[in-house]
Amino acid sequence: MIDKVKSPLLTEKSIRLLQKNQYTFQVNSDVNKTEFKKWIEIFFKVKVMSINSCRPPRKKKRIGLISGYTVRYKKIIVTLKSGDSIPLFSI
């Protein structure tokens, strides 16, 4: 399962969500919520309250005459029980 998690997302919005005890990850498109919830609870030893996921739209990119699209990915936002935290995001 760890190979399906690409990276933690650190954007302005995700840093703002850290105050609400919500953590954002970029994952492969084939990961579902239940698998990810079990993995987070086992790996980080925390209690997951809810999980939200979305697939942001691709953006059109152009380099010279060649045009294409950015790679599509899946973003998962995990809400933890108050008092729990993931040390990976410690700032």
Swiss-Prot record:
Signal peptide: none annotated. One of its GO terms (molecular function) is structural constituent of ribosome. The keyword Ribosomal protein applies. The keyword RNA-binding applies. One of its GO terms (cellular component) is ribonucleoprotein complex. Pfam families: Ribosomal_L23. GO terms for biological process: translation. Binds to 23S rRNA. NCBIfam families: PRK05738.2-4 (NF004363). Belongs to the universal ribosomal protein uL23 family. Part of the 50S ribosomal subunit. This is Large ribosomal subunit protein uL23c. The lineage of its organism: Eukaryota, Viridiplantae, Streptophyta, Coleochaetophyceae, Coleochaetales.
